[in-house]
Amino acid sequence: MSKPYFPVESLYRMPWTMPDNGITWLEPTSQCNLSCYGCYRKNIKNSHKTMEQVKQELDFFQSQRKSDCISIAGGDPLVYPHIIELVKEIKSRGMKPIINTNGIALTKELLHELKKAGVFGFTFHIDSKQGRGREEKWRNKNEVELNELRLYYAEMLASEGGIACSFNSTVYGDTLQYVPELVAWAQKHIDIVDTMVFILFRYITPNTPFNFYVGDQKIVWTDIHYHSDQEEVVDLKSPMIVEKIRERFPDFTPSAFLNGTHKADDYKWLLSERIGNKDKIFGYTGKKFMELVMSVYHYKYDKYLSYASPKTLAMGRSTMFVLSLFDKGVRKALKNYLKYLVVNPFRIFKKAHLQSILIIQPPDLMANGDQSMCDGCPDITYWKDKDGTEKLVWSCRLEEPMKYGDFLRMVPKREEGTEKGKDKVLHYSYGNNSD
């Protein structure tokens, strides 16, 4: 019997479920000012939804699901003409507006207006596979060289003040090597970078051993948006990222996770929370810290925490002193911190911060054609089918109902039947959404 990579008792299973979650995903537009390899969403010009449509989606979300924040995504939400009004709307509903963007359209003036509207934070997606749209100076830069661009946005948010700052990066087979450097860069800027997210690359490739169907109709695999005509590494797993990070940070320790829908030891969302400053990481919180934070926050606000404010994350020192009573990881961090002070007591004037490192492992293809999704998916979004039925669906697979009217199913090529109709191959175009 194979053993899980992490002992089951070492991690806190995040309590997020379909009706009670930390995050919900809103897409006001599918238009983007970048064309990125690896993106899950088709770039559709002039696809902006009206504010009435967006409000309807928010109404449906709130009728079905508790959320601490709304991730405003796309497309790129900063090209959405009503973005300031949308941020105000989300804020007025008692949720935290988080903008997921590539940052190209962000100016200091727009940032200031968004802060006045109530924006809580930004998650910037920056990686070396992003295509046309950025300035020429960023072309052909590797992940480490792009830290200069990341720092530009982190400092912009820090200058405005009071806005959470996160970065996403897709991890490919040839960029895995850079992950430890990005984690080290995040520590260097732990005072202004709150979260680093690593999303493992997933695409359909020529050797994918499945055929694809909607109903009984076979779909040409090259018609599916998220496909590559060349072979790629599409089976990276969260433990592989942990092993790579530990080459630079041997004590790196996750404390919480979301499992897969088909496998309990698929670490779909794997979260590490570390405490430190620019000089040193003192330690990593344990599962009891995560359980306590989630339980207390839910007791107080009747929803689970997603993003914390920069002010809260700057309380690393008080976190160590207070919560060391309850959590082994925090207790170890406190011991290391006290040793750090003994060497030079004046170090007490340096703030300690909390910083999150999150690894996301998208859908995995099972041998029978099933897909193991994130159990309690945080990035659930809205879909209205051709019959007008509103649904909560996976944002990472939204292209399927958008194009085909339903989610695709996969049949292993070696098991495929020979019935009539399965030889009929259809090409689909977009436009099935009743909206």
Predicted feature descriptions by range:
Residues 2-30, 154-163:
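N-terminal/domain-start segments enriched in small and hydrophobic, helix-friendly residues
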Residues 1-16, 266-435:
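Radical SAM enzyme core and accessory elements
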Residues 32, 99, 390:
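Conserved, mostly hydrophobic/aromatic
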Residues 2-20, 37-38, 206, 210, ...:
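Conserved N-terminal glycine/acidic-rich loop preference
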